[in-house]
């Protein structure tokens, strides 16, 4: 009792924590408790772990924020047996893994057993985050502490153990991509900066670009890479549509038409030329039809030479304005283009 009072009167400097090693717990605390049951330590309380639930132990401890230490007498499951009772009112402690040897100067002095608390009853108990390290004496130190130095052996039924109890998190980490996304999300939520390489990698892996062209109505031929690689950003619907010989064949159904042959030849010679530019240079759909009917090659210069003759026609409804800008009659041009594709 005097020893406990002397320890209680110690004034430790701020910042000191009770964080002993396994060997220190055995030799400086448990061995003294086994040798003398009246021994009391400043940082280690006494508790019956079979009558206390793990979540109640922090309030019974003398000190500790994340780890709590207790002296405990082993509770025998049967009066005449040596099996330890590990059950509480809400669950039970289950041993896991192998016992660890604890040495002092190459001499075996104790053993450490790891136990996990399960709620409910075995074998259908639910695992919790509460973990306990149970320390017991072993070897010559055990024999000495059990009372051989006092001339009488102690009963193994009253065996003292020292327990360290703490709680672990049961949150499982996901896949590698989930970790990176969680880290980036947390950093963004805190307003912090993240690595650009990690952010770019996640962005590139999560974004799926849509196809540039609809291949459902295309013919058997392959699509020209020069055509598919071009991405337009025009606000006008007509400006973004470029000539595609494969698509023309797919809609036309064959190569027998001289108009389609001329169009195919033009598409092979002038990649990247929009339909609007073609229509304007030839004064619309009528100019294209006349050029195809006459067997001439579809050259922009030739189409420009026929501008005055074709502008006099009232069937097309197009003006002879040389201004390349699209006028307010864009709806009519869209109708001509629809007729062109359905030719």
Curated annotation (Swiss-Prot):
GO terms for biological process: abscisic acid-activated signaling pathway; auxin-activated signaling pathway; ethylene-activated signaling pathway; gibberellic acid mediated signaling pathway; regulation of DNA-templated transcription. The keyword Transcription regulation applies. It comes from the Eukaryota. Gene3D superfamilies: NAC domain. Induction: Up-regulated during leaf senescence. Induced by salt stress. One of its GO terms (molecular function) is DNA binding. Residues 304-333 are annotated as: Disordered. The keyword DNA-binding applies. This is NAC domain-containing protein 4. It comes from Oryza sativa subsp. japonica.
């Amino acid at each position: 009792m005097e020893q406990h009072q002397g320890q209680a009167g110690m004034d430790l400097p701020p910042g000191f924590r009770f964080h002993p090693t396994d060997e220190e717990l055995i030799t400086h605390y448990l061995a003294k408790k086994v040798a003398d049951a009246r021994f009391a330590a400043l940082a280690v309380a006494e508790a019956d772990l079979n009558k206390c639930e793990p979540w109640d132990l922090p309030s019974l401890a003398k000190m500790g924020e994340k780890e709590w230490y207790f002296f405990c007498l082993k509770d025998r499951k049967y009066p005449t047996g040596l099996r330890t009772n590990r059950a509480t009112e809400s669950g039970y402690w289950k041993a896991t893994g192998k016992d660890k040897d604890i040495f002092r100067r190459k001499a075996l002095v104790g053993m450490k057993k790891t136990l996990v608390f399960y709620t409910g009853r075995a074998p259908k108990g639910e695992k919790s985050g509460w973990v306990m390290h149970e320390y017991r004496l072993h070897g010559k130190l055990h024999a000495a502490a059990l009372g051989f130095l006092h001339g009488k052996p102690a009963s193994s039924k009253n065996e003292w153990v020292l327990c360290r109890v703490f709680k672990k998190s049961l949150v499982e980490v996901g896949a590698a991509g989930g970790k990176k996304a969680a880290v980036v999300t947390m950093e963004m939520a805190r307003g912090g900066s993240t690595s650009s390489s990690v952010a770019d990698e996640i962005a590139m892996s999560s974004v799926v670009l849509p196809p540039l062209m609809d291949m459902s109505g295309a013919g058997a031929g392959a699509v020209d890479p020069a055509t598919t690689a071009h991405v337009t950003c025009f606000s006008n619907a007509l400006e973004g549509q470029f000539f595609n010989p494969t698509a023309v064949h797919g809609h036309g159904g064959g190569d027998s038409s001289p108009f389609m042959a001329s169009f195919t030849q033009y598409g092979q010679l002038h990649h990247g030329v929009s339909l609007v530019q073609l229509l304007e240079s030839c004064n619309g759909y009528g100019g294209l039809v006349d050029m195809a009917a006459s067997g001439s090659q579809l050259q922009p210069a030739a189409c420009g030479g026929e501008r005055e003759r074709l502008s006099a026609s009232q069937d097309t409804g197009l003006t002879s304005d040389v201004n390349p800008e699209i006028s307010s009659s864009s709806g009519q041009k869209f109708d001509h283009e629809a007729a062109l594709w359905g030719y």
